[in-house]
Amino acid sequence: MFNLRYFPLIISLSFTVPIYAEDVEEIVVTALKRSSTVVDTPAAITAISSTEIEDKGITNMHDLKHLVPSMNFTSVLGAQNITIRGIGQFNGNPGVSVSTDGIFQSRAHSSQLGEMDLERVEVLRGPQGTLYGRNSIGGVVNLITKNPTQDMDGYVKLGYGEYDITTAEAAFGGGISDNTSFRLVVHGTEQGEGFYDCLNTGCGEQGYTDKQAFRLKIKSDLSDTVSADLMVASVETEGTPDPYGCLTDNR
């Protein structure tokens, strides 16, 4: 016998599922050196869009570890130590490759250049040596920054957080001519005079960090399919490292 009590539930599901599917954001990635959606990319990949970056307050690489499975992150004086699935190392040749706009960052400090004005973040887990070469046995982190456009736009961000950390970031860009545009972003971070005391005599407060960075991108469309891109970037970091070693015998 047909039970009418199940009929309203069937109707409800038939309308609810398509509506939910329409709200899913489709992210196009370039992790395989070509454009494809996350669903069509045959790799263990996590993609974070610019909308999610803004909504969740992602400002640096440290914030990514809360969104990417199997990823961990530590930092000493701005030097990034990334591990994916437990693979990674902290020296001049890390086990996880970091690229900014497709440019390999060979040193740990260099990855800070891609933390500003992000358009998208792509994290590939597992060995990626075939496409990305050395330093990618653990995986790859692709930082894609915003490109210049003909529309004039910009923003200013100010922040203050725990341990007396202050941040400031500003970006501005637009068209220079009919086929040339630019985008400039500057960033500064300062973390007080330190937030903990070193017990050894003479070392005082530790944990101070001071960082200034900028990036200028210029794009010229030579034709409908060819463009010339120029990027100039710099980052300078000062601070006190995390103290380690034997404590002074002050008994």
Show where each model-derived region lies.
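Cleavable N-terminal targeting peptides that direct proteins into the secretory/outer-membrane pathway or into
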Residues: M1-E22
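N-terminal periplasmic "start-of-domain" segments of outer-membrane beta-barrel proteins
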Residues: V24-K56, Q80-N81, V96, V121
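Extracytoplasmic beta-strand/coil segments of soluble accessory domains associated
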Residues: T30, H62-I103, E119
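Non-catalytic regulatory/gating segments with a bias toward low-complexity or hydrophobic composition
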Residues: I45, I53, L64-K65, V121-G126, ...
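N-terminal periplasmic accessory domains that precede
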Residues: M61-L64, N81-R85, S99, V123, ...
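Short acidic/polar hinge/loop motifs at secondary-structure boundaries
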Residues: D101-P127
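Transmembrane beta-barrel wall of Gram-negative outer-membrane proteins
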Residues: D153-Y155, Y160-Q191, F195-D242, C246
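Surface-exposed loop/turn segments flanking beta-strands in extracellular/periplasmic regions
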Residues: T248-R251
